[in-house]
């Protein structure tokens, strides 16, 4: 399968987190997340670097708990950090602090290019969607107002027009076999080198 390159990649990794402390001891609470998770090394090892065009925008969701690791993932995938967009929720949960925010790190590959609207706010307020871990639809509008096609959503929950998707809850448009993607990227680089 030939992989295309993307100008926009949105990722909402299924960070490996479990309920802990007092929260886990409450009998009526779920102790495990209602979906499969990946550890940080598994997320880092996804071949995202090979799917990104020069100037590609990366929008990487993270929780407060995994903020440090999200920066590591961004760097491993070959992106440079530019800013953080914070989603302020109307309610939250937590043991010691009530966490009402989630963050999306924005980065770019090689050079930062904006061909569309700029000067967007880095904080937004939106209601919490009905499904666990789902992000607000307004965020897609924000991305589409800034970042170009081709667009790819990783760990997608549903298909959105104008986007390719990959995830265990959707019919994926791409395969993310690390070796397959890396081999194809090497062949593509070899072709470009021989033409130069």
Task: Map each language-model feature to its residues.
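Class I S-adenosyl-L-methionine-dependent methyltransferase catalytic core
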Residues: 1-196
């Amino acid at each position: 399968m030939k992989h295309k390159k993307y100008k926009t990649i949105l990722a909402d990794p299924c960070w490996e987190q479990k309920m802990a402390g007092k929260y886990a001891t409450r009998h009526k609470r779920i102790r495990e997340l209602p979906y499969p998770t990946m550890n940080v090394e598994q997320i880092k090892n996804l071949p995202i670097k090979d799917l990104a065009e020069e100037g590609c925008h990366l929008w990487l969701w993270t929780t407060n708990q995994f903020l440090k690791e999200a920066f590591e993932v961004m760097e491993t995938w070959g992106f440079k950090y530019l800013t953080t967009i914070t989603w302020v929720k109307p309610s939250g949960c937590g043991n010691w602090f009530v966490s009402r925010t989630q963050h999306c790190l924005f980065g770019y590959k090689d050079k930062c290019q904006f061909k569309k609207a700029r000067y967007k706010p880095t904080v937004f307020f939106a209601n919490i969607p009905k499904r666990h871990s789902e992000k607000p639809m307004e965020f897609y509008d924000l991305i589409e107002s800034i970042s170009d096609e081709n667009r790819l959503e990783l760990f997608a929950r549903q298909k959105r027009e104008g986007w390719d998707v990959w995830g265990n809850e959707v019919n994926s448009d791409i395969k993310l076999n690390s070796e397959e993607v890396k081999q194809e990227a090497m062949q593509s680089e070899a072709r470009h080198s021989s033409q130069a």
